[in-house]
Amino acid sequence: RLISLVLVLMLVMTAGCGKKSTTKKLKTEDLDETTLQGMAKDITKEMSLKNKIGQLFMVSVYQLDEAESKNQTSVTSQMKKTLKKYPAGGVIMFAKNINTPDQTKKMTDELQDASYIPLFMAVDEEGGQVSRVASNPKMKMTAYPSAQEVGRTYNDKKIAQMGKTQGKELKELGFNMNLAPVADVLTNKNNTEIGDRSFGTDSKKVANIITTLVKNMQKQQISA
């Protein structure tokens, strides 16, 4: 979590703000583990206990303002107040909070602006039945089949492209975390909870697919 916090801080601080910068953009892949650990410790030294505890939690949009509908698609003043009082580590958005590209980007931006500490802005975009963004035609996001279908028919090149494309398109909407892919190996065909959300029954094959997807999403600055 400490290193992840550093990456989010760097992502937000190096994001464009409409002005040219004379500072060279720092790439996280250029930093080794020891450097990241040191940066993380420096950041957390300046954080209060309340803020540190808050970083352990990811909340839904509805939990930030329970007076509003769970289908909320805009940031309310209460949401901003809640984030200020309870500095959560991240916010997850579901399909009911995602309507159009402009609306989604505005919402993720306003939530980030309302938080003292940069947020993990998360979504579930696995492909197939769990596609919070691509399932909405108005979002015009590239749709992918189920993990089962990907594992059965995609080669390494297509899998890498899938990770890159998902990462790029999610980043454009203001997300920096994808709660995917599912790493479960399908060991029980009667497990309907996982079902076609798994890439297959072979653990090595599943591990290779997961690794490829995650690496390519991370290249787009999406935590996965």
Q: What role is predicted for each listed range?
A:
Residues 19-46, 52-54, 69, 77:
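N-terminal, intrinsically disordered, polar/charged segments of Gram-positive cell-envelope systems
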Residues 62-66, 72, 82-209:
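Enzymes and membrane/adaptor proteins characterized by extended Gly/Ser/Thr/Asp/Glu-rich
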Residues 209-224:
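Phosphate/pyrophosphate-binding betaalpha-module
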